[in-house]
Every structure is written in C-alpha cells, then in structure tokens.
Regions:
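Extreme N-terminal cap/leader segments of soluble proteins
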Residues: 1-58, 77, 82, 86, ...
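Short alpha-helix capping/helix-loop boundary micro-motifs
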Residues: 137-141
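Short, conserved glycine- and acidic-residue-centered signature motifs
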Residues: 63, 67, 98, 145, ...
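Short, well-ordered amphipathic alpha-helical segments that serve as non-catalytic structural scaffolds
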Residues: 62-74, 104-105
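Short, acidic (Asp/Glu-rich) active-site segment that either coordinates a divalent metal cofactor
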Residues: 40-43, 142-193
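Glycine-/charge-enriched secondary-structure boundary and capping motifs
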Residues: 1-12, 37, 57, 91-117, ...
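Short, surface-exposed beta-edge/turn micro-motifs
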Residues: 27, 150-151, 249-252
Length: 306
C-alpha cells in the first residue's frame, strides 16, 4: 500500500477492524458460500443530510447505523452474512473521525458474524457511506411469495425511530429509548432465519414505513393485504398513525401460511422480541393495503424522490 493521505486513511481503517478485515489486500474479494446455497447481495447508501445529520449522532453511531441498515436487507431475504464492503465519501475535516466511524461499522458487522472484505475511500462534499453486503441462503425469502390466506406478522414494536426523528427535526431531545432505536437499529438476521425455517414465504424489512413496505410486498406478490391497525404493536406514547408511517424501523413483515407451526410465544422466548399477527392476505390481483376495509391512504411513509 502506497504513501499519502488516502492510503493512510485505509491503513487506519484496517487497524481499527483488525482480524475482522484480515482478507483485505487484493484487488477484489474472494468468498466461499456453502454448497447448495445461493448468493444474496444488496447495496445501501447512507448520506449526510438525507439519512442523518452529523449533529444528531456520533461518528460511531453513524457507522453502526449504516451497517445495520445494509445488513437488514439480508435479514429480509433470510440470508446469512458472509461479507461487507464499505465505500466512504469523506468531507474535509473528517479524517479525525474515521476511527470511530470505522469502529461503528465494525462493531455491527461483528455482531452479525460478517467479515469486512473490501471497499473504497474518496473525497466528498458531504459524508456518505455506501455499503454492499453479501450473504447466502438455501431458500431466500422473496417479497413475491405471499398467497391468499397467509397471515401477516411483524417483529418488534413500531414508532420509536419516527418519534426520535420528529423530535430532532423540532430541535428537541428525543426520548432515550426512541433515540436508541433511531441511531442503533438491530438487523433481524437470526429472527429471519427462524421465521424462514418455520414457513415464512414472503418478507420485507421496514425501512420506508409499515404501510409503504406492506404495499411493496403486496405489489411484488400480486395480492392485497388487510391489516388491523389495532393489532400493530407500538412503543409507549406513539399513535398508531405515527407507528404506521415510522420509517427506518428495520423490523420484519412476513407472510406465513395458516398451516405453519409458527408460535409467537416461542419466538418471543427465543429472541426477547414480540411477534404479532397484524393481518391477512385477502385476494390476488389488486395489490392494495386496507385497514379494516378502508384503503390505507395518507400513511405512505418515506419516499426518497418525492
């Protein structure tokens, strides 16, 4: 590795990650996946003033949050992580923050059992982290597998990240528990594999909001969903409407055949997390989401380009 600020930055990243990035050094990474499994790949961007503001979070939190968001896409597919690549755009004055930023990425990747296998560093006007994650799954869970009669389940409780974001945008200090859910989401990797083993046949992670992502799943599956907003588990102090619209939850919405052996009490004992039935797949063709019979309009969630 040569001399200069760029290579000094890369060396600093490698020192921070240690053995977790031991394979970095060639022009490309070479990964092995278990025989009979399929490669699952996703890329996720975290951009300053779009996904976060620097005054809201520490550098370590920014790195960890970006890694968790990317790994959540593997969770949605029921995949086991096998590699992470980080492309960093660094603004002037941020070199001193690289070590905690890298530590945040590394801590979350390590908790997922995911090695860091490569990346890139470049100058940028604003901080950005583009993370590519790779995983493997014997039978990936698509968005497109929901069928009429399936039961729709969600993991976790909703509304914390949205409540934290509203407080931050208003210049207020968020409730500590809400802030923790906003800055330190947990990708539901183990939970997704358990759900897949127990019959889940369609899944999506909740990044844009529950209604928005339910609509994505319905459209991919060519079905309509009937959800009961009264059943949606909300964090204390958050309305159902706000919980439905709250993005960046990184919980899972899954479709499960009625004959499945999934038991919510068994799931909660295993993971310390609620699993709640919130609706059913009602019909093929229309690709709509209804709340007790009424179309779910006005609860669209986040749209990057609107």
């Amino acid at each position: 590795m040569g001399a200069g600020a760029e290579f000094d930055a890369i060396r600093g990243l490698l020192v921070t990650w240690g053995a977790q990035a031991a394979g970095i050094g060639d022009d490309a990474a070479v990964l092995a996946i278990p025989a009979g499994e399929r490669l699952v790949v996703s890329t996720d961007a975290s951009v300053e003033n779009v996904h976060f503001r620097r005054e809201w979070m520490t550098a370590e939190e920014i790195g960890g949050r970006a890694a968790a968001a990317a790994l959540s896409d593997l969770a949605a597919m029921g995949a086991t992580p096998c590699g992470l690549l980080l492309a960093l755009g660094i603004p002037k004055g941020w070199l001193s923050e690289l070590e905690p930023l890298a530590r945040g990425v590394g801590t979350v990747a390590a908790s997922a059992g995911c090695p860091i296998v490569g990346g890139n560093v470049s100058a940028a006007g604003e901080l950005s982290l583009t993370i590519t994650v790779l995983g493997s799954a014997g039978q990936p869970i698509p968005r497109s597998g929901a069928r009429q009669g399936d039961i729709m389940f969600v993991t976790g409780r909703f509304g914390g990240p949205g409540a934290a974001l509203r407080a931050l945008l208003a210049g207020r200090q968020p409730v500590a528990a809400h802030r923790a859910r906003f800055v330190a989401p947990v990708p539901r990797l183990r939970e997704a594999r358990w759900l897949a083993e127990h019959g889940a046949r369609a899944a999506i992670d909740i990044s844009d909001g529950l209604v928005a992502d339910a609509s994505h799943l319905a459209r991919a599956s060519g079905v309509s969903l009937s959800l009961d907003e009264r059943a949606v588990p909300c964090v204390p102090g958050v309305s159902v409407e706000d919980a439905f619209a709250s993005g960046e939850e990184y919980e899972l919405l899954v479709a499960v055949p009625p004959a499945s052996d999934i038991r919510a009490d068994e799931f909660e004992r295993e993971f310390g997390l609620p699993l709640t039935a919130i609706g059913v797949v009602i019909a093929p063709g229309a690709s709509a989401v209804t709340l007790r019979g009424s179309l779910a309009v006005g609860l669209r969630g986040y749209d990057h380009l609107s």
